[in-house]
Amino acid sequence: SVDDTKEIIEVLKQRFPDIKGPSTEDICYATTNRQLAVKSMADMCDYVLVIGAQNSSNSQRLVEVAKKNGVSNSYLISDEDDLNIFLNNFNFTDSINIGLTAGASAPETLVQILISKLKRKFEVNLINHEVVKEDIIFNLPKSLR
């Protein structure tokens, strides 16, 4: 995670004062923002579901950040089948809070499909927990316009 990397860099700087590190601009803004959001919502959650591919290090770090911040019930959900397994393996008898986030490359359509599935099974009260406003816009290449 970004936090783990910072800790390692600090130890290296103490041991090697003249060391030159990578620019902090090299870390994807979306990765940093999502990790900050998971940290800030962790104390409100009984579970954290991270939507993303199993081979996505970004998504795996989000699960780790949630666990490190006190949500031991944090899971990577890559598709509807994973969500079904999650829902079938837990007995949700009480009101619970599920934090939902997605890796930087997770398609928004998958996020919406999984939210719809949760709404069909439970009474859902969605709260958009925005920590950082992402206002960076990437233009499509000319060949795709």
Residue ranges and their predicted role:
Residues S1-F16:
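Glycine-rich phosphate/diphosphate-binding loop of Rossmann-like nucleotide-binding domains
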Residues D4-I8, R34, L62, L110-V111:
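Residues at alpha-helix caps and immediate loop-helix transition turns in enzyme cores, especially N-
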Residues T5, T24, T31-T32, T93, ...:
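Residue-identity detector for threonine
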Residues L12-Y47, G52-A53, Q60-D81, I136, ...:
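Active-site rim loops that border cofactor/substrate pockets in soluble metabolic enzymes
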Residues D43, Y47-V50, N55-S56, R61, ...:
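C-terminal functional extensions of proteins
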Residues D81-N89:
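Helix-loop module immediately N-terminal to the HCX5R catalytic loop
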